[in-house]
C-alpha cells in the first residue's frame, strides 16, 4: 500500500514538470534572429539551456534554441516574417 502511494506521488510530480521546446527563436513579428550576436547567449538570456546557429530556408542562418520556455515565441512555419 505504501509503495502505491509513493508511486502515485512520484507520478504526479513527473507529470507536473514543465518541459521546454526547441526551435528558432523569433521576435514579435515572427522574424528569426540571425546568428549575430552569438546564439548561445541570446537563447540563454531567454531561458533556454543552449543555442546554436542553424540554417532555415528561406531565412538563412538563424538562432536555434534548445529547451526554450513556453512563453518565448518560436518560428511559426505557416506565418511569414512581418517586417513592415
From Swiss-Prot:
GO terms for molecular function: sodium channel inhibitor activity; toxin activity. Expressed by the venom gland. Residues 21-82 form the LCN-type CS-alpha/beta domain. PROSITE patterns: LCN_CSAB (PS51863). Residues 84 form a propeptide. Alpha toxins bind voltage-independently at site-3 of sodium channels (Nav) and inhibit the inactivation of the activated channels, thereby blocking neuronal transmission. This toxin seems to specifically act on Nav1.6/SCN8A sodium channel. In vitro, it inhibits the proliferation of the prostate cancer cell line DU145 (IC(50)=15 uM). It shows low effect on the adhesion of DU145 cells to fibronectin (at 15 uM) and is inactive on DU145 cells migration. This is Toxin Aah4. It comes from Androctonus australis.
Amino acid at each position: 500500500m505504501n509503495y502505491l502511494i509513493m508511486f502515485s506521488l512520484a507520478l504526479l510530480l513527473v507529470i507536473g514538470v514543465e518541459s521546454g521546446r526547441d526551435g528558432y527563436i523569433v521576435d514579435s513579428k515572427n522574424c528569426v534572429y540571425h546568428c549575430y550576436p552569438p546564439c548561445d547567449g541570446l537563447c540563454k538570456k531567454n531561458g533556454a539551456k543552449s543555442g546554436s546557429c542553424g540554417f532555415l530556408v528561406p531565412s538563412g542562418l538563424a538562432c536555434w534554441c534548445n529547451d526554450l520556455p513556453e512563453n518565448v515565441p518560436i518560428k511559426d512555419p505557416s506565418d511569414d516574417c512581418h517586417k513592415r
